Amino acid sequence: MASLLKAFIDPKKNFLARMHMKAISTRLRRYGLRYDDLYDQYYSMDIKEAMNRLPREVVDARNQRLKRAMDLSMKHEYLPKDLQAVQTPFRGYLQDMLALVERESKEREALGALPLYQRTLP
């Protein structure tokens, strides 16, 4: 069952997945975003922790891309075609760190320790 699901969502094997990936890529390129920019740090504490561990330059570049995308959206415009061509929407920067943080939190849970970011009142 798992192999069937992996084959179904793999863009190399499934035409619909390939079309979906192309549509997502086009929409992200219009605003100059990357797929990892769509993660909300207020949604999950793991994402927030992964963002805190990233280098400052990466976080600043992410914030700049998000501000530019919001500005373009407010103006009902897209990036110029020459800038859209150089965008890399699926070049990830957060996935590796997020996987590390999730692995650490699962390990802490297995050991019976409290998560690093769980707040408790004295």
From Swiss-Prot:
Signal peptide, first to last residue = none
Does the keyword field hold Transcription? no
Q: Which UniProt keywords apply?
A: Electron transport, Membrane, Mitochondrion, Mitochondrion inner membrane, Respiratory chain, Transport
Q: Which GO terms describe its cellular component?
A: mitochondrial inner membrane; mitochondrion; plant-type vacuole; plasma membrane; respiratory chain complex III
Indicate where this protein resides in the cell.
Answer: Mitochondrion inner membrane
The answer on whether this UniProt entry bears the keyword Membrane reads yes
Q: How does it sit in the membrane?
A: Peripheral membrane protein
- Some GO term, biological process aspect, for this entry: which one? mitochondrial electron transport, ubiquinol to cytochrome c
Q: Which InterPro entries match?
A: QCR7 (IPR003197), QCR7_sf (IPR036544)
Q: What role is this protein assigned?
A: Component of the ubiquinol-cytochrome c oxidoreductase, a multisubunit transmembrane complex that is part of the mitochondrial electron transport chain which drives oxidative phosphorylation.
The family assignment reads: Belongs to the UQCRB/QCR7 family.
Q: Quaternary arrangement and interactors, per the entry?
A: Component of the ubiquinol-cytochrome c oxidoreductase (cytochrome b-c1 complex, complex III, CIII), a multisubunit enzyme composed of 10 subunits. The complex is composed of 3 respiratory subunits cytochrome b (MT-CYB), cytochrome c1 (CYC1-1 or CYC1-2) and Rieske protein (UCR1-1 or UCR1-2), 2 core protein subunits MPPalpha1 (or MPPalpha2) and MPPB, and 5 low-molecular weight protein subunits QCR7-1 (or QCR7-2), UCRQ-1 (or UCRQ-2), QCR9, UCRY and probably QCR6-1 (or QCR6-2).
Instruction: Specify the protein name.
Output: Cytochrome b-c1 complex subunit 7-1, mitochondrial
Q: Which organism is it from?
A: Arabidopsis thaliana (Mouse-ear cress)
Q: Which gene carries the instructions for this protein?
A: QCR7-1
